[in-house]
């Protein structure tokens, strides 16, 4: 006699259907569609956990650049001067300073700003 794995099969299918419970229509009712939906959602979640890090770093840089341009400095020059001055502050903290405590960011800008004493060469 053939053995039907009813309990095991039902439990396995219910697990997939429970994971797809927030979906719409057939995607939450049909086992096959639910399984495909959950697998694709897992792929997107995996990808987006990595993208999230990139997007936040871009946001911090964007905010910082906007605050720095108001002070007459660009982001790239600012980061270069920070590295030369051996000041180690990450972009997240700098972004928060730019938004919540601009006076402290101005203090950092003033410490790294140097008067430009470049010799001018006269063309003859």
UniProtKB/Swiss-Prot annotation:
Q: Name any one GO molecular function.
A: structural constituent of ribosome
Has keyword Zinc? no
Keywords associated with the record? Ribonucleoprotein, Ribosomal protein, RNA-binding, rRNA-binding
**Gene Ontology cellular-component terms listed:** cytosolic large ribosomal subunit
- Quick check: keyword Cell inner membrane in the entry? no
List, alphabetically, the PROSITE patterns matched. RIBOSOMAL_L20
Question: A GO BP term, please?
Answer: translation
- Sequence intervals crossing the membrane: none
Main role? Binds directly to 23S ribosomal RNA and is necessary for the in vitro assembly process of the 50S ribosomal subunit. It is not involved in the protein synthesizing functions of that subunit.
Protein name as catalogued: Large ribosomal subunit protein bL20
| Organism ancestry | Bacteria, Bacillati, Mycoplasmatota, Mycoplasmoidales, Mycoplasmoidaceae
Per the record, the gene is rplT
């Amino acid at each position: 006699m053939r053995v039907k794995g009813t309990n095991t099969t039902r439990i396995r299918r219910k697990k997939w259907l429970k994971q797809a419970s927030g979906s719409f229509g057939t995607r939450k009712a049909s086992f096959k569609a639910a399984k495909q939906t959950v697998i694709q959602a897992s792929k997107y979640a995996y990808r987006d956990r990595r993208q999230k890090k990139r997007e936040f770093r871009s946001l911090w840089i964007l905010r910082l650049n906007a605050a720095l341009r108001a002070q007459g400095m660009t982001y790239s020059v600012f980061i270069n001067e920070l590295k030369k001055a051996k000041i180690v502050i990450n972009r997240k903290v700098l972004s928060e300073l730019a938004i919540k405590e601009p006076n402290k960011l101005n203090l950092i800008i003033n410490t790294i700003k140097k008067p430009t004493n470049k010799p001018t060469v006269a063309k003859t």
